């Protein structure tokens, strides 16, 4: 039997499980519900009453790697076996570096080492800063430019997928895994650290600039106009004009997420997804207020 996959058929793309079409009648559980197998018993009762055959539920980095290099998959084991015992299926949501553009589910050893695992600054020089219309609450997130954080997240996700293959590679209780959740930052269109300023002033990678210019027809109007009117090479501002900061963030975030996803796929080539915040048009999203997992820049993902 093959693992769950997407197959092209005459009438569209079909999810298959054990080589047969599978329609997910699914619901997503609350963020904390899946932190307890015992609590999930009541959730499964509700799912059964609603006629669901699949649940989407979080598995978080701080749960599986509470100390660096020390992995605990007991909760994952319990959740998978529980679902299997009920004849149901799961889609796992990996809350790693980001959950809703914040780092609340990263392990304590990541969150407390600010030198090694840098924060994404929305105000230069400040690792925590208030956002507009956020009632004065301080905001903090991990930097999408930090190599150490990306590498640590990728290692953890790879170990998760390796364990999942051993646990579930034959039964396929888990149909797919989502990597991160609304990745990026809030409150500004790009990071404001000195490192981010240097990267933003540097030349856009030529393969990426060329890809964007060759896919103009897929873009919303504002992005299309910015690419058409921009330089063919040069800094992010020179190439992408008024949307440069948003595209800069999306470029580095998507590279980061893709690296994490690749680490998992190498261990277990299950279906992998990302979560995008849906907007109709870049002019209708408030740049820097929404998370950068935004469909206004989805054109970039195939090259990254």
Q: Where in this protein do the model-derived segments appear?
A:
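N-terminal carbohydrate-binding accessory modules
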Residues: 1-53
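Extracellular/periplasmic catalytic domains that process cell-envelope and extracellular macromolecules
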Residues: 16-19, 48-49, 85-86, 168-171, ...
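Structural preference for beta-strand elements that scaffold enzyme active sites
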Residues: 22-26, 54-56, 87-91, 172-178, ...
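Polysaccharide-binding and catalytic clefts of secreted carbohydrate-active enzymes
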Residues: 114-298
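Aromatic-lined substrate-binding rim segments of carbohydrate-active enzymes
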Residues: 39-119, 256-267
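Short, acidic/polar
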Residues: 32-49, 284-303
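Short, solvent-exposed turn/loop segments enriched in Gly/Ser/Thr/Pro and often Arg
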Residues: 30, 58-60, 94-101, 178-183, ...
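Extracytoplasmic/periplasmic, Sec-exported soluble proteins
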Residues: 35-39, 68-71, 141, 145-152
């Amino acid at each position: 039997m093959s693992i769950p996959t997407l197959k092209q058929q005459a009438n569209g793309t079909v999810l298959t499980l054990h080589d047969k079409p599978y329609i997910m009648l699914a619901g997503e559980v609350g963020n904390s519900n899946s932190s307890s197998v015992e609590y999930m018993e009541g959730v499964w009762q509700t799912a059964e009453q609603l006629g669901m055959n699949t649940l989407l539920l979080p598995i978080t980095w701080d749960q599986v790697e509470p100390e660096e290099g020390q992995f605990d998959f007991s909760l994952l084991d319990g959740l998978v076996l529980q679902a299997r015992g009920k004849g149901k299926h799961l889609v796992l949501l990996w809350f790693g570096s980001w959950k809703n553009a914040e780092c609340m589910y990263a392990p304590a050893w990541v969150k407390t080492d600010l030198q090694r695992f840098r924060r994404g600054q929305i105000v230069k020089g400040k690792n925590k800063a208030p956002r507009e219309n956020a009632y004065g609450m301080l905001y903090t997130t991990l930097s999408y430019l930090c190599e150490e954080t990306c590498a640590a997240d990728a290692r953890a996700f790879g170990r998760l997928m390796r364990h999942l293959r051993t646990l579930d590679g034959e039964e396929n209780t888990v149909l797919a895994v989502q990597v991160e959740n609304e990745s990026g930052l809030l409150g500004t269109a790009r990071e404001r650290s000195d490192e981010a300023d240097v990267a933003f002033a540097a030349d856009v990678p030529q393969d990426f600039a060329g890809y964007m210019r060759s896919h103009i027809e897929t873009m919303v109007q504002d992005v299309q106009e910015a690419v058409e009117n921009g330089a063919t090479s040069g800094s992010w501002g020179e190439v992408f004009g008024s949307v440069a900061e948003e595209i800069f963030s999306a470029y580095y975030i998507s590279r980061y997420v893709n690296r994490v996803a690749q680490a998992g796929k190498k261990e277990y080539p299950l279906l992998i997804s990302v979560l995008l915040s849906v907007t109709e048009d870049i002019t209708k999203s408030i740049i820097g207020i929404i998370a950068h997992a935004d469909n206004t820049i989805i054109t970039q993902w195939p090259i990254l």
